[in-house]
Amino acid sequence: MTTKYITMNIKLSYHWAAAALLAIATGCSNDNITPETKPDSGKPETTQVSFIAGNEGTRTSLNYDKEDFYWEDGDRIFVEDDDHTFHASSNAVSGSKVSHFKFMMPGKYTANDYIVYYPGKNGTNNQVTISANQTQTEPDNTLHFGTSGDCGTGKATRQTNGQYTFKLNHSATYLCFKPTFDHPLASTYVTKIEVTADQPIAGSYTLGTDGKLTGTGSSTTITLNLKGTGSYAKGFPMQNDATAKKCAAGRMFMVMMPGKYKLTVKYYVTDTETQVSGVITKKFPAFEYGANDYYDIPSALNIKYYGDDYYTWDAKKDYWYGHKNDQPKEMGIPGSNYPTSADADRWFNPAKFPAKASHTAKDCPNVNEIMWYCKKGDPHWDDTTLWTVWQHLYTGGMWFKKASVIAKENGEANAAALKSKSPDGKDRTSKGEFETPPNNTSITQKVPDDRSKYFFLPAIGYYAAGKLTDFGGHGRYWTSTPYPYDKNISYNLYFHAHDVVVSNGSDRWNGYRLWTSE
């Protein structure tokens, strides 16, 4: 058996890892041999023939790191005897991680060799069921293989003492997932993994004498439920590493019918503190998944991370600079040491129109650009895409068309051309317009079909007098343009689920987000 590592950079490829699982004979050479199970003394040896699974063969569970395989509690084998009758072993494995076992077989056996069938714990004879609903109760554990569809065959050969020995070769495919994220997360769990193929990957199959599975199957989707007891009752936790800069869950394993498939993998995650759940989807092109092989599926969770810096308009430093411990991370909680006019670094820039921002907001879009985003950006409200700040999961935000897309669709030379004038032809950066805040209430309530043409802004709220406000439901993003008619106001992009506004009524001392044109 080998482990194959699958990587994806638009197109899927794989390579053999130098340290991958080698032939199991090598992986099992260091197994400790447990005492053989003896037949009942009251049963004649002529009716109970020994079929011994030696330490040189594969078993039915895996220690992934040590590359050791074991038989597990309740495992039985089946053999078709001289009378063409299938028999189950009269005994089953007792205990866990058993490396060597003597199965006692009723029936008539006079030939030199026989095919041994292991159809899994839910199978009989040579009939196998690869389950469409599999459950793993703790990370890095494969005890569920037997009930999920693990199966195999082996050639049992008669020895001089009349016993038969065999090596089990597995017939299913095994997928390995290890979800990771490049920032720390708290109270976040992976609750299930769902794999969907372009043809059936689970159902009822027949084990052939050649060890191959045949049959059409019945389900194109396999769900791996990740739930146990104790610390795993809510799912498998994303654990922060020693540096507290990233996190990972343990390995998760799925049994699948071998074949060539296009796979869609969905990771279901939940944050038990914020009560936010979501799905992260990855698609893989057609690939041949072989029998008796493990495949490491790329499992980096694509969750957008946002920092927690907010700013008064064009301040030199962020709103909570030097006072991060005072920054509220929940709404309604007042924070002390928020900016005042006495703090030159955190207080807003008093520049007057038509001057532009010269500090932290200098690279933000100007008022002309946000007019384009508002009126021509085809805004889409999205309450499903996950994003994270403060080690927790959240949803809520707006998609806008990229400036380059807007320019092309509206006959402008390029994205930079949007800086010089608004959609109505007026340049609001050089001449003031006293007007009701322009807005757009035509908001599509879903993720854009072609996200490559759009960019996303989270509804990450703002700070007013030290209080976090409208978090998760509203977004406020500064521009580089002061408002012409009030020295304490600057333009900003404001949105919620049903409206996008070119806001001209926001005080500069509020803590809003910075951003750049896409």
Language-model features, listed with the residues they occupy:
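Sec-type signal peptide cleavage vicinity
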Residues: 2-384, 394-399
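C-terminal, surface-exposed recognition/capping segments
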Residues: 387, 394-518
